Amino acid sequence: MVGLPDSAVKESHQRILSALQVTGYKMPTSNIVINMAPADIRKEGSSYDLPLAIGMLAASETISSQKLSRYMIMGELSLDGTIQPIKGALPIAIKAREEGFTGLIVPLQNAREAAVVNHLSVYGVSNIQEVIEFINDKHELTPTTVQTREEFYACQSDFEYDFADVKGQENVKRALEVAAAGGHNLIMVGAPGSGKSMMAKRLPSILPPLSLGESLETTKIHSVAGKLGRNSSLISQRPFRDPHHTISQVAMVGGGSFPQPGEISLAHNGVLFLDELPEFNRSVLEVLRQPLEDRRITISRVKSTIDYPASFMLVASMNPCPCGYYNHPTKPCVCNPGQVQKYLNKISGPLLDRIDIQIEIVPVPFEKISEQRQGESSAAIRQRVIKARPVSYTHLRAHETDSYLV
């Protein structure tokens, strides 16, 4: 096998051999040379198992090759011949349509994800026997269909968290509403238990809904990273990513030997929430400066350069001091001025300059929390946010077009 295959691709020989034996087929006894072109790009992952197996059977004339020119085939093989899900099914489907293929054969779990692409018949298969019989015209596969637009719009308002659950904090809610309307970055400073994380988790519920074009772009990123759930189609809600403060620089911005999207790209068109901001490594925070300006991240390697979109809304929270009770109305702070200053200096000035709204949060009194009256709902706030956007959601829906979607 030539053409810069990685170890996973090289190991496909054993998986293919076992899968074919289980289904009653044998590998050709002669030496086989497989050239994976272009030779200067490294091939990675196990998604080549199924096309390699089918290609070898066709080359040895064990199966018919008449249909193969019309179909792109991708999938990982298990030792028993079953087909496992792969990463990047949606970008693969888009590429298949661009290259003029009429059909795409993928693992059953990836079929709905790929089927959002129009003018392309997508077939989900669960084992290699189904593929062989389909190619030999002994078995018909049913194309997977997805009602893309109906499903997309039906799930746009189904949120787990709602601002109606938040008691008090009207000034913070107003700040979050302004941030949502303008796409501004925001930092909340307050004592532990003042509701910073609770309100941040509810921010996606008041952001304007995704357009179909934004959803396609967001779904492609999550597909490449392998973050889509099984049997998923388009992402219908804005992403909310909240990495732990121990995250590495590569995990935040993306990279690795085979560059993958990082948290800032997974938060594209959504929210990146950094809880306890000063606890993050200084180098991790500093790499956010360029993506916050350019709205994309460039990952450079010796052989290639990859651009990932990173247009996210940064929301951060932090305590005002190491003990957390500086300026607290009832609890005393035990930190000296030097400790407070050292704690605040963990966040650089250039990064703070990129955070448009900085607000202090005061804990809500018990009497306010115990009230029966609910706060304003996310749906009501969201309507005001949509109206405040330069281009309303109604205008977006009337003009959104994406030639790839069903």
Residue ranges and their predicted role:
Residues V189-A225:
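Walker A/P-loop
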Residues E286-V302, I306:
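Conserved catalytic/switch belt of AAA+ P-loop NTPases
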Residues P259-Q260, S265-N269, S300-N319, T330-K331, ...:
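AAA+/SF3 P-loop NTPase mechanochemical coupling elements
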Residues M1-I187, A191-S194:
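Peripheral, non-AAA+ core regions of ATP-driven protein-machinery
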Residues K331-I361:
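A short helix-turn-beta junction within AAA+ P-loop NTPase domains corresponding to the substrate/partner-engaging
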Residues T394-T401:
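Conserved small/polar residues in nucleotide/adenosyl-binding loops
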Residues P261-L292, Y326, L351:
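Conserved AAA+/SF3 P-loop NTPase catalytic/coupling segment centered on the Walker-B
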Residues E140-V178, G213-I264:
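P-loop NTPase nucleotide-binding/switch module
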